[in-house]
From Swiss-Prot:
Protein name: Cytochrome b
Annotated binding of heme b b566, by residue: 98, 197
Cofactor binding note of this UniProt entry: Binds 2 heme b groups non-covalently.
Pfam families in UniProt: Cytochrom_B_C, Cytochrome_B
Source organism (scientific name): Paradisaea minor (Lesser bird of paradise)
Origin organism lineage: Eukaryota, Metazoa, Chordata, Craniata, Vertebrata
GO biological process, one term: mitochondrial electron transport, ubiquinol to cytochrome c
Annotated residues for binding of heme b b562: 84, 183
Binding positions (a ubiquinone): 202
Gene: MT-CYB
């Protein structure tokens, strides 16, 4: 009998076991599509990024003009740039939905997979931040100045750390060149971590909407979920193309059309939309070090979620009180995102402080209490 190459070849076997013959729960919904969508986002960003890097010049006197040149004179340069800039937004939409799915259905109980996922999120945030600095517009420059300057709040070593990161006494040419180097490197780190993430996931197998073991009812990934994923790819790539072709600057900041000027500060310094929730939490605390700690905690709190699980059920499918809490948390994050885009004045200050307080209270206090309460109510 002829050998089946797909199942016996050392390399093809790995691909086969991850994408073709992978045993998958028969009842996973469209919410399980976002992992593969994130993979497509990463590939798209690496390809468009590579094409952009071929025409970009990492020098303060040339960076802004090299981006302008790319959009005017390079074949489809405008399209590649718009796909790359808006692809980042789509990447964050997908990762936030992916994390929300994991939170709702208790996927975080696969602790290794979850922890690698949080590290992936942090790496993605770092990549997006250094990438935003590269066009060297006003918001690029001032965003870099404000955010890197936060490290100076660290006691004793803060100032030294910031000057070391800058490569001088302010954000200047050395900062831009190292940010370009980091922005080129980090996506490949993300790709490596993704493989680790998948390795850990395939140790336990996927979770499912009921949060119960599904070993007795698994189906092959291909053709059932591969065809389902293709629908997701099509919808995502259509929305990316629509955004990039019809309103490429919708999510950008108009300040970034002005070349960086260290002598003129923009009236409202704010990051891209996907960082606004964390920025609002940072601003809600009047003390610099306190704000930095809250900013770090807003993402690092995800590491604690598996430890705070008190319910005897894995998923929230049959836990109405936790569901209410979950959607309040989602609303709270949307409020934080909106407040982060507003100027620092009344009433936004107090709204931001209340929303920040609620964010940490729900995750650290209310979820564990409600989980235990539901056990009581259901006599579990």
């Amino acid at each position: 009998m002829a050998l089946n190459l797909r199942k016996n070849h050392p390399l093809l076997k790995i691909i086969n076991d991850s994408l073709i013959d992978l045993p998958t729960p028969s009842n996973i919904s469209i919410w399980w599509n976002f992992g593969s969508l994130l993979g497509i986002c990463l590939v798209t960003q690496i390809i468009t990024g590579l094409l952009l890097a071929a025409h970009y010049t990492a020098d303060t006197s040339l960076a802004f003009n090299s981006v302008a040149h790319m959009c005017r004179n390079v074949q489809f340069g405008w399209l590649i740039r718009n796909l790359h800039a808006n692809g980042a937004s789509l990447f964050f939409i997908c990762i936030y939905l992916h994390i929300g799915r994991g939170f709702y259905y208790g996927s975080y109980l696969n602790k290794e997979t979850w922890n690698i996922g949080v590290i992936l999120l942090l790496t993605l945030m770092a990549t997006a931040f250094v990438g935003y600095v590269l066009p060297w517009g006003q918001m690029s420059f001032w965003g870099a100045t404000v955010i890197t300057n936060l490290f100076s709040a660290i006691p004793y070593i803060g100032q030294t750390l910031v000057e070391w990161a800058w490569g001088g006494f302010s954000v200047d040419n050395p900062t831009l060149t190292r940010f370009f180097a980091l922005h080129f490197l980090l996506p490949f780190v993300i790709a490596g971590l993704t493989l680790v993430h998948l390795t850990f996931l395939h140790e336990t197998g996927s979770n499912n909407p009921l949060g119960i073991p599904s070993d007795c009812d698994k189906i092959p990934f291909h053709p059932y979920y591969s065809i389902k994923d293709i629908l997701g790819f099509a919808l995502m790539l259509i929305s990316l193309a629509t955004l990039a072709l019809f309103s490429p600057n919708l999510l950008g900041d108009p300040e970034n059309f002005t070349p960086a000027n260290p002598l003129a500060t923009p009236p409202h310094i704010k990051p891209e939309w996907y960082f606004l929730f964390a920025y609002a939490i940072l601003r809600s605390i009047p003390n610099k070090l306190g704000g930095v700690l809250a900013l770090a905690a807003s993402v690092l709190v995800l590491f604690l979620i598996p430890l705070l699980h008190t319910s005897k059920q894995r998923s929230m499918t049959f836990r109405p009180l936790s569901q209410i809490l979950f959607w309040i948390l989602v609303t709270d994050l949307l409020i934080l995102t909106w407040v982060g885009s507003q100027p620092v004045e009344h009433p936004f200050i107090i709204i931001g402080q209340l929303a920040s307080f609620l964010y940490f209270t729900i995750i650290l206090v209310l979820f564990p209490i409600v989980g235990a309460l539901e056990n009581k109510l259901l006599n579990l």
